Amino acid sequence: MRRSKQGAEGKAEKKAARSAGVCRTTLPGGLRVVTEHLPAVRSASVGVWVGVGSRDEGATVAGAAHFLEHLLFKSTSTRTAMDIAQAIDAVGGELNAFTAKEHTCYYAHVLDSDLELAVDLVADVVLNGRCAVDDVELERDVVLEEIAMRDDDPEDALGDMFLAALFGDHPVGRPVIGTMESVSAMTRTQLHSFHVRRYTPERMVVAVAGNVDHDEMVALVREHFGSRLIRGRQSAPPRKSTGRINGGPALTLGKRDAEQTHVLLGVRTPGRSWEHRWALSVLHTALGGGLSSRLFQEIRETRGLAYSVYSALDIFADSGALSVYAACLPGRFADVMQVISEVLASVAGDGITEAECRIAKGSLRGGIILGLEDSNSWMSRLGRSELNYGKYRGIEHTLQQIDEVTVEQVNALAHQLLNKRYGAAVLGPYASKKTLPRQLRIMVN
């Protein structure tokens, strides 16, 4: 019966597409398997990427994707949490997971000889996590401790405040981890329903990189995922677009007994499929992405006003955020904001130079290549590419896109984005509207 069943499934299976060492197969039900053969390594990394994150949650279950990620490791129908831990420890591997705004990833990194165990463990956790009542209560306490720890970290807390200021009541603006209130109120039924409704095969990608064979990998996935994934899964509900955001960018203030004042300000950007995506990355890098960037040089190296200052770029499917962060002594806050506003105004008006554009492009290229030093990095690139674009975008394609960026494109983009109204968050001992520097008040109004 098993052999006959596999034969029937094989007829519906889409033939593997092969490109430069990368192979792709779509199984019945829509589950995609993407592999990259890296013959020079003795390791293998397996990741199950689920196209579900915190932006897919309703307000009453904020933090459900992250809570569920924790919970699925507690027990399955055949393994306890200790069984799972001992199985991966016995081969010297790594088994972990993380949740983001738009996806959740469960992954294992092992020797190539232990690949089947890795697939078995990850599949068991993702598909058969029990969501038992006792486990829910135990892990709830762990997540609440994690929220408290995040709230104690000024940069983490500020990041959540900033996205809320920029995206308002849209799910993108809520913390991935949830809040004390939402996690405390979440029920086992809600978490189980989230698992069943959101973890559907068409939203899943199994990405594998290392010393692996594609056909063998597909066979392993069919064996360990198989009918357990295909049967009994409803179609996933649609994702809420960021086009429906109530209100414009705002200002959020948080008072905290600390030595420094922290500020994060920025603007909304288009999403990852935007034709100027890499010009945006060049702009971010030139602004505050490196040691030679405008902000770092002007605020830290030239004036010594702050130790930590940088820009950041968050890109989602249909929107994003270009932001600037700085932390300084409260007495220097006005001076720091003066320099930030001058740098942003200068780049918005006059743009960056050819030399700055060249350095930023080189920084991006080098960072991408250096970031692919192990099988885990290649696996992550495979999974993200398939989940975000529905196809493999090789490193050569990305590097070519960066090379094609011109300084004229970057400067047109700077003029378009940096003249917009800013959203901002301020956290510190004297954070109030009365004490805000004039430059910041102008930028957020």
From Swiss-Prot:
Cofactor: Zn(2+)
One GO term of the biological process aspect: proteolysis
Enzyme class: hydrolase
Pfam families in alphabetical order: Peptidase_M16 (PF00675), Peptidase_M16_C (PF05193)
UniProt cross-references to InterPro entries, sorted A to Z: Metalloenz_LuxS/M16 (IPR011249), MPP/UQCRC_Complex (IPR050361), Pept_M16_N (IPR011765), Pept_M16_Zn_BS (IPR001431), Peptidase_M16_C (IPR007863)
UniProtKB keywords: Hydrolase, Metal-binding, Metalloprotease, Protease, Zinc
Protein name (Swiss-Prot/TrEMBL): Uncharacterized zinc protease ML0855
Annotated Zn(2+) binding sites: H66, H70, E146
Family, per entry: Belongs to the peptidase M16 family.
Entry's Gene Ontology molecular function annotations: metal ion binding; metalloendopeptidase activity
Active-site residue list: E69 (proton acceptor)
Gene3D superfamilies: Metalloenzyme, LuxS/M16 peptidase-like
PROSITE patterns according to UniProt: INSULINASE
Record's cofactor remark: Binds 1 zinc ion per subunit.
SUPFAM superfamilies: LuxS/MPP-like metallohydrolase
Domain of life of the source: Bacteria
Any coiled-coil regions, as ranges: none
Classification lineage: Bacteria, Bacillati, Actinomycetota, Actinomycetes, Mycobacteriales
Region described as Disordered: 232-251
Entry's EC annotation: 3.4.24.-
